[in-house]
Amino acid sequence: FTHMLLQKAGVPTPDATVAFSKDSALEALKKHGFPKIIKPTVGSWGRMVSKLNDMDAAEGIIEGREAMYPIHHIHFLEEFVQRPPRDIRVIVIGDNVAAGIYRNSGDGNWKTNTHLGGSAETCEITNELEDICIKAKDAVFGDIVGIDLMESNEKGMVVHEINNTTEFRNVVRVTGVDIPGLMLEHVKGLA
């Protein structure tokens, strides 16, 4: 649903397909090719996010998901974006892009989650980054969100996730921006 709202609003995203069964997921992969990323529709910390390099890997991972709760029978298949070995996490509070960090992949891992060994460093908020993040927040009717973006080698900046219960510990640690304080001030202003 988030992906559709972003596309409707003209926010750049990786190409994606949603499948509601093992057979339709495998058919989509045959049609669109590899590599692909398969993600749960709800989750955090990169858990259950896998890179599918071929049909054998796809069949094994999708078969495992089919044995789980029905929510995991929704297969969100996303293009594998060729990019630098990092992504960007930006915290948006109301109409303020508060801070951002680069999350660098660790130990050759394609995932950028810092708890998997990645590192974080400050990301300058450019006008382009600010515009995309505000547009993305508005597209999903968000107020306080974490937006994850990738710098695609082909498409430029693309939004690959929006978190309405975002983690911000590393953003605070790296940038020194008081995200909890900004959130509190924003919420008090809404009262």
Segments (PLM) and residue ranges:
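Short, glycine/acidic-enriched loop or turn micro-motifs at the edges of active sites
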Residues: 42, 82, 149-151, 164
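C-terminal active-site "lid" helix and adjoining low-complexity regulatory extension at the edge
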Residues: 138, 151-191
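Active-site nucleotide/adenylate-binding loops and adjacent lid/helix of ATP-dependent enzymes
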Residues: 1-76, 82-85, 127, 191
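A short glycine-rich, hydrophobically flanked beta-strand micro-motif that places a catalytic Asp/Glu
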Residues: 78-79, 88, 142-154
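Phosphate-binding site of ATP-dependent enzymes
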Residues: 47-139
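Generic beta-strand structural signal
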Residues: 18, 92-93, 151
